[in-house]
């Protein structure tokens, strides 16, 4: 019956599943997948302090474990993975907006070349052997107008074309392209529906069909061959809606709503399943350890 109702409403069928919660609830975290495991990095704690904690979730065993703490406590940082290494870039610390680049391999953090300029509340994605940092802010309230690309073989940063400036956006790689999804210009009344893509090496971003609903403080991931946009916050509170974009269509389709609406959340994809972990259940400084996943199909 539920599947029929969802189909009639233009919602793709699927059922959210709950996993064991993040051991320490946080919001404004960074997340990435390394070797089939999900790494959750930093974020705000319930008391407003930033965290350096790194927790690792195995969907196969449904268990959490600790990884070495990040060398600095951060919130609004960006994370991505490539060939068994976790990269954590930028974010806010007690000293301001960071330029830092850290890589974790063999349970040891290594500090790499810093970004050309500070970044926080941006999106991160890996495509064509480069880690892209798109959007975000140079410092609180100052939108970034260019993006950065980190060559993962030469370990060097370059400046590349940026998407339309906005912060608290999401980024993901799909089909060899980098996508910049939604975000906002400042406060939660400035949320955007804008979605753009970049082909590595191109000099400009291309607009793709916009999201059906604006959102900031959102997350996105590639799963099941589609780009999945999850959650966020707006003037009415946290956002439950979930949409999937098929580049071959090209159009957005509605998926089942997120059971625990959140902003500042980690969204990652493993195969056809999207995982949504941590975040704030209400706008502002509220924390959650929720761990929910959805099979979006192939």
Feature annotation, model-predicted:
Residues 1-5:
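Bacterial N-terminal signal peptides that target proteins for export
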Residues 6-298:
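Kelch-like beta-propeller repeat domains
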